[in-house]
């Protein structure tokens, strides 16, 4: 059979002419045009394939043989409409540049490409897609799998509205914007399908208001890692929970002991232990050689029993036991921490040191006082007693150690940290109000001899109590002018305190919902992972790191290929989204996990 090409109207069509009894010719339209499928935009190999298939089809028809099933699905010759001539018949659309004859870089850069997204056609240039060669559309080898030689275009059965943002990513040089009519989970799925990369995904999360998940660093040494997980993360294992329970009990015992030892009955008993009564002195002997000896003997019982009686104090024993546990816990955590510098700068670890430090100072002071001649002068004793009281007060900070084991206290701390600006404004407004109204009430009550305000600084207390709407009543205005000032002070205090409160409450709700959503997401991820393992759907496409808890596992791997994405691997293992809005995150998680096997969501 002989195949020859004849020019059509556009100068690039072809006509088949067969020889012998199997000769076949191109189907001509009434106007004399060729009705064969357009081939001007195809490369040489595609043209040969199309012509060979068409000739085989006609030979089979002339020989009276039935057509094979695949051959029956080939498009029949038809006349091109005006739209087809403008769109599909355009020789510049959908050209596969990797199979064409060599062209200069300028013409290849401006060559047009036709992309069909579920029936909606987009047109762009090769140079636009080539800006990101590692993506699906930017890599000629990757996008070749989606090329349709019959329609001369790239076809993707994906979400149509999302492609506006994907194409804008190429046109703008890397700016990713989600269309308003596309949900977050659908657009995130499209980003992964078109393989825009992790950097584009991170920028998308930041633009949408998502927070980057904090990475928990772990020590490299296996033994240190296990110890760190046990003492730092109570939810990592059963032994970690046991250690956390013991730590909480010790903290509570220490706080209860700190409070009980101030009761009058216990305080009097401790004073008796510390300073036992001096036994009655015998009559003074006559002056002589034995006088100094008897004086020394009379002072002996007041010094010797002090040290053992102090160590025998039950509160001292309980306090020593608690401090031993706190010291052991702090040293173990310091030994196993991944970074000594970060450990030293952590506020919670500073609180641990502050909670332990007073005990050793108190112990050293007690031992110094028990030494012969350590009593010293009364002035030194009063000074050491004042210092001890301040140091012992620091022990109350041990209550903050509970925040390590309480999510609620952690949320409260993050709320206060995020609201420092609002709290500063609140204190500044209160300071202005206190100065203003204390001065006003002083001068309003100055002529009254029974006034409670002797000076402006003396009126500061009244202004603070009134602005905070506490009103103890120990200081109050008497005159009419003073009462008017007091009324204005109370109203100003209510308005001043009410202004920053909504912002603080909003921050608290934000951190609270973020924590609860994170727990739900981790539980959902763990449940879905268990289901996949039970059904045998886990493949070797991801590298898994073994650890004590699923929440501490990190998954990684290369970008998915288009086939694996079509099969619908779980997107939650590759994209951890944390939203400011609880509703957005719940909707995203539900949509992502409800049906991961679908290819498009219109």
Swiss-Prot record:
A lipid is attached at residue 337 (S-palmitoyl cysteine). Residues 261-314, 369-384, 443-456, 477-483 are extracellular. Induction: Expression regulated by cAMP in a tissue-specific manner. In primary cardiac cells, levels increase by 6-fold, and in GH3 cells, levels decrease 5-6-fold. This is Potassium voltage-gated channel subfamily A member 5. The chain crosses the membrane at residues 239-260, 315-336, 348-368, 385-405, 421-442, 484-512. Keywords: Cell membrane, Ion channel, Ion transport, Isopeptide bond, Lipoprotein, Membrane, Palmitate, Phosphoprotein, Potassium, Potassium channel, Potassium transport, Transmembrane, Transmembrane helix, Transport, Ubl conjugation, Voltage-gated channel. It comes from Rattus norvegicus. Pfam families: BTB_2, Ion_trans. It comes from the Eukaryota. Residues 58-107, 523-543 are annotated as: Disordered. A motif (Selectivity filter) lies at residues 469-474. Belongs to the potassium channel family. A (Shaker) (TC 1.A.1.2) subfamily. Kv1.5/KCNA5 sub-subfamily. There is a cross-link at residues 212, 525 (Glycyl lysine isopeptide (Lys-Gly) (interchain with G-Cter in SUMO)). Expressed equally in atrium, ventricle, aorta and skeletal muscle. Weaker expression in brain.
């Amino acid at each position: 059979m002989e195949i020859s090409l004849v020019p059509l109207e556009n100068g690039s069509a072809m006509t088949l002419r067969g020889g012998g009894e199997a000769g076949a010719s191109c189907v001509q339209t009434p106007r004399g045009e060729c009705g064969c499928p357009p081939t001007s935009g195809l490369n040489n190999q595609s043209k040969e394939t199309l012509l060979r298939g068409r000739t085989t089809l006609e030979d089979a028809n002339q020989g009276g043989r039935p057509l094979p099933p695949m051959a029956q699905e080939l498009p029949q010759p038809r006349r091109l409409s005006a739209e087809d001539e403008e769109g599909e018949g355009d020789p510049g659309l959908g050209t596969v540049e990797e199979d064409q004859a060599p062209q200069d870089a300028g013409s290849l850069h401006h060559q047009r490409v036709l992309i069909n997204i579920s029936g909606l056609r987009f047109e762009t240039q090769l140079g636009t897609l080539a800006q990101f060669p590692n993506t699906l559309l930017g890599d000629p080898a990757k996008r070749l799998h989606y090329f349709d030689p019959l329609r001369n275009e790239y076809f993707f059965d994906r979400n149509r509205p999302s492609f506006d943002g994907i194409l804008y990513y190429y046109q703008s040089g890397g700016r990713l914007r989600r269309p308003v009519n596309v949900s977050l989970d659908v657009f995130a799925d499209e980003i992964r399908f078109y393989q825009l990369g992790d950097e584009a995904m991170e920028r998308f999360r930041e633009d949408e208001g998502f927070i980057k998940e904090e990475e928990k660093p772990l020590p490299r040494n296996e033994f240190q890692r296990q110890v760190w997980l046990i003492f730092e993360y109570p939810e990592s294992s059963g032994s970690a929970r046991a250690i956390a329970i013991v730590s909480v009990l010790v903290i509570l015992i220490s706080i209860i002991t700190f409070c009980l030892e101030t009761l009058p009955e216990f305080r009097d008993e401790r004073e008796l232990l510390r300073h036992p009564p001096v036994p009655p002195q015998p009559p003074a002997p006559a002056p002589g050689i034995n006088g100094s000896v008897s004086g020394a003997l009379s002072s002996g019982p007041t010094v010797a029993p002090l040290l053992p009686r102090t160590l025998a104090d039950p509160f001292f024993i309980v306090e020593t036991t608690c401090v031993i546990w706190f010291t052991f816990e702090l040293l173990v955590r310091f030994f196993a921490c991944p970074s000594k510098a970060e450990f030293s700068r952590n506020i919670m670890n500073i609180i641990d040191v502050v909670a332990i430090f007073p005990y050793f100072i108190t112990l050293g002071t007690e031992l110094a006082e028990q030494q012969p001649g350590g009593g010293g002068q009364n002035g030194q004793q009063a000074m050491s007693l004042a210092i001890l009281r301040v140091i012992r007060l620091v022990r109350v900070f041990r209550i903050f150690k509970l925040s390590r084991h309480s999510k609620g206290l952690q949320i409260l701390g993050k709320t206060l940290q995020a609201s420092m600006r609002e709290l500063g404004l609140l204190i500044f407004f209160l300071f202005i109000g206190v100065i203003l109204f204390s001065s006003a009430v002083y001068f309003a009550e100055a002529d009254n001899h029974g006034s409670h305000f002797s000076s402006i600084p003396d009126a500061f207390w009244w202004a603070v109590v009134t602005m905070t709407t506490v009103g103890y009543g120990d200081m109050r205005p008497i005159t009419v002018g003073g009462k008017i000032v007091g009324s204005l002070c109370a109203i100003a205090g209510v308005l001043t305190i009410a202004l920053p409160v909504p912002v603080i409450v909003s921050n608290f709700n934000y951190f609270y919902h973020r924590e609860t959503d994170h727990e739900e997401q981790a539980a959902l991820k763990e449940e879905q992972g268990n289901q996949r393992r039970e059904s045998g759907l886990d493949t070797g496409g991801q590298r898994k790191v073994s650890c004590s808890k699923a929440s501490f596992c990190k998954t990684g791997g290369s970008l998915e290929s288009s086939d694996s994405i079509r099969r619908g691997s779980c997107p939650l293992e590759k994209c951890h989204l944390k939203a400011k809005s609880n509703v957005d995150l719940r909707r995203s998680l539900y949509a992502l996990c409800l049906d991961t096997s679908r290819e498009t969501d219109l």
